[in-house]
Amino acid sequence: MYIPQKQLETLTKILQPSKVIVVYGPRRCGKTTLLNEFLKGVNLRYLLVSGEDIVVQNYLSSQSIEKLLSFVGANQLLVIDEAQKINNIGMNLKLIVDHMKDVKIIATGSSSFDLAKNLGEPL
């Protein structure tokens, strides 16, 4: 799948610590491909996970700050594909951002309604 360079440049430009970038769109439109292509050029320690993975759901739906921080570890970038599958994802991403000021986060979702509902308040 072709990924326009402009999309990669935009992601690079807006990726900042203490912010969450949400990439959403219909299934099979290229969100995961965009992320994989983006990650090829990133010079950060990153963790790429899927919200469909039950272990990931267990960690990222937890409201334990200690559990969330241990999951992210020393990574500088957390990338969550299918984030809408994780309960309380919005509140928990906010906890990560509030307690790990240097971490950058990208979340994707195929259902903007479900993702928006689970994100709750703007981050």
What is each model feature region?
Residues 1-123:
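Phosphate-binding site recognition
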